[in-house]
Amino acid sequence: MELNNIPKYSIRGLNIWGFRDMAHFLDHIFQREQVKTGTMVAINAEKVLTAEEDTALSTLLSDAEYLYADGISIVRAIRRKYPDTEVSRVAGADLWEAIMERAGKEGTPIFLVGGKPEILKQTESKLRAQWNVNIVGSQNGYFTPEERNAVFERIHASGAVIVTVAMGSPKQEIFMRDCRKIHSNALYMGVGGTYDVFTGHVKRAPKAWQNLGLEWLYRLLSQPSRIRRQFKLLKFIGYYYSGRL
């Protein structure tokens, strides 16, 4: 696959990019010392189902340039609907770290948004120490609706080329959409709880679980309160086996 000819696969009306691996995704984003612009959103089965019930979220996802297969359920759905495809799972937390490492090497200006104040500070410190990331500004997730435009203006004034937003869905998608109206020439990435994972405050599943596609089960065992959310995924399983993907 050429870097500018990446296939897209339709799953329940969402067009998901088919990157064959992490390196392929990174090479597409960082081309000729320039970073692609647009909005990146991680897609899993839960987000697909939520978008079917939430018109506003569906519109946000449709408007985003990069929907990528974060969940193993999405990868398997694509492979079932489109046999012989090379698409692979690209976990959002891993992708964010890879982008930060690459940005550090190239001196790309980064602006961080979201998270608790102390978590954000730890994230900044670790990024600078680990990869010499050029962080040109940050804003924790505790700001009022009245302060949003001021945050947008700060991001614009910083000259950030990559903006990562950790506010949870759909708040982060809404934030990225609105911020792009002020600062359009940047790559935006919604990262959920990635800062918490990066700083060690939340544990990810062991690599063996991740490689088996069982990270969702690990999270469920660690957080039994997620059981209702997992029951919701039975609907996606129904789509999978009935050929309604």
Swiss-Prot record:
A Pfam cross-reference name: Glyco_tran_WecG
Metabolic or biological pathway, per its Swiss-Prot or TrEMBL entry: Bacterial outer membrane biogenesis; enterobacterial common antigen biosynthesis
An annotated GO BP: enterobacterial common antigen biosynthetic process
Highest taxon in the source lineage: Bacteria
E.C. code: 2.4.1.180
Single GO MF annotation: lipopolysaccharide N-acetylmannosaminouronosyltransferase activity
Family: Belongs to the glycosyltransferase 26 family.
Name of protein: UDP-N-acetyl-D-mannosaminuronic acid transferase
Organism whose genome encodes this protein: Photorhabdus laumondii subsp. laumondii (strain DSM 15139 / CIP 105565 / TT01) (Photorhabdus luminescens subsp. laumondii)
Gene that encodes it: wecG
